[in-house]
Amino acid sequence: MKSYLVGGAVRDALLGLPVKDRDWVVVGATPQQMLDAGYQQVGRDFPVFLHPQSREEYALARTERKSGAGYTGFTCYAAPDVTLEADLLRRDLTVNALAQDADGAIIDPYGGQNDLRKRLLRHVSPAFSEDPLRVLRVARFAARYAHLGFRIAEETQALMAAIVEAGELAHLTPERVWKETESALTTRNPQVFFQTLRDCQALKVLFPEIDALYGVPAPAKWHPEIDTGLHTLMTVTMAAMLSPDVDVRFATLCHDLGKGLTPKALWPRHHGHGPAGVKLVEQLCARLRVPNDIRDLAKLVAEYHDLIHTLPILQPKTLVKLFDSIDAWRKPQRVQQIALTSEADVRGRTGFEASDYPQGRLLLEAWEVAQSVSTKEVVAAGFKGAEIREELTRRRIAAVAQWKEQRCPQPQG
């Protein structure tokens, strides 16, 4: 009975990255031996145990055989005669098929260390194509390690495209697609995840609303990159630089979905694309079962991002109404989130990456001014019932108007 550290912990240690989770494989043991040693069994589908002290996961070495459709259609075989090499063979990428023994020696039967040096994401065996979830996993790894120069091997890209072409992605549950997407959105380069999916034709299957933006032009004066799909990924790149918040990054991804609905006869203009995009955001989020708070911000950003760009000329009444519409009084974080997504939109354009975005600062200033109006003072002044809200709104508009005269003076004449 021997235990080996496996997978991501070995990979990240070799890359000099922090190791977060440590997983182990046990060779030559039975479930009863693990229980007798004080381990707690937690795996339903195959034997996984928690260490009595560290609570880290220890799985019995196993092999997998395809027995049904999708990423759950596997029959597992775990027994003392399963070797470490056989266990590592079932893994997705060579860089994940690494193990380390108790003495620190690396076991690398499939060339994972060489691929780490080459910065290559390459599948271990042809069995890669039996699991459609691996299309998303590899796209996520590509995003996670893009800053280190990793790329996907051509032969692995070909297998990913074959999985998509065979219709295997239909077997993925919405929850699993969202989980992988959410994880990809936390990486340094989330745009790589979506570009990778597009390269293997998976984007139009899983995110047709985003795929529809490719080939849709915008006015070259405002969008030198012209293509709305390119612009979308440029804004996601910028959002990742501006904020670690998944809500902000996802909302940025969805901000221009409405442009995919513009009739070709009206191109390259997209009047009203913001409100039009709200329904597409709802559609995408319902299909992937995106959490409500993330969905709601994305809807607001789709509807109002163009309005924020015109902030210096907005009427005080319009600004206060905007704060009402985004429910800022109860969810004040939305003001900052919407400011960041709007900035990502403006800077996510060819040649505008280093642009200043004063509208974001002005939005936050206007919010501070509107928020400073005291509800207690309104109540103390004798207003009751519906009058309180009306007077609050009046005072907020007056305060924002006074601030705006100083910060955004209008030209005379």
From Swiss-Prot:
Disulfide bond entries: none
BP GO annotations: RNA repair; tRNA 3'-terminal CCA addition
Subunit structure as annotated in this protein's UniProt entry: Monomer. Can also form homodimers and oligomers.
EC number: 2.7.7.72, 3.1.3.-, 3.1.4.-
Additional free-text comment from the UniProt record: A single active site specifically recognizes both ATP and CTP and is responsible for their addition.
List of residues binding CTP: 8, 11, 91, 137, 140
Protein name: Multifunctional CCA protein
Listed CDD domains: HDc (cd00077), NT_ClassII-CCAase (cd05398)
HAMAP family reported in the protein's UniProt record: CCA_bact_type1, CCA_bact_type2
Amino acids binding ATP: 8, 11, 91, 137, 140
Catalytic reaction annotation: a tRNA precursor + 2 CTP + ATP = a tRNA with a 3' CCA end + 3 diphosphate; a tRNA with a 3' CCA end + 2 CTP + ATP = a tRNA with a 3' CCACCA end + 3 diphosphate
Cofactor binding, note field: Magnesium is required for nucleotidyltransferase activity.
Domain remarks in the Swiss-Prot or TrEMBL record: Comprises two domains: an N-terminal domain containing the nucleotidyltransferase activity and a C-terminal HD domain associated with both phosphodiesterase and phosphatase activities.
Function as written in the Swiss-Prot or TrEMBL entry: Catalyzes the addition and repair of the essential 3'-terminal CCA sequence in tRNAs without using a nucleic acid template. Adds these three nucleotides in the order of C, C, and A to the tRNA nucleotide-73, using CTP and ATP as substrates and producing inorganic pyrophosphate. tRNA 3'-terminal CCA addition is required both for tRNA processing and repair. Also involved in tRNA surveillance by mediating tandem CCA addition to generate a CCACCA at the 3' terminus of unstable tRNAs. While stable tRNAs receive only 3'-terminal CCA, unstable tRNAs are marked with CCACCA and rapidly degraded.
Transmembrane regions: none
InterPro entries: CCA_bact, HD/PDEase_dom, HD_domain, NT_sf, PolA_pol_head_dom, PolyA_RNA-bd, tRNA_CCA-adding_enzyme
Binding site for Mg(2+): 21, 23
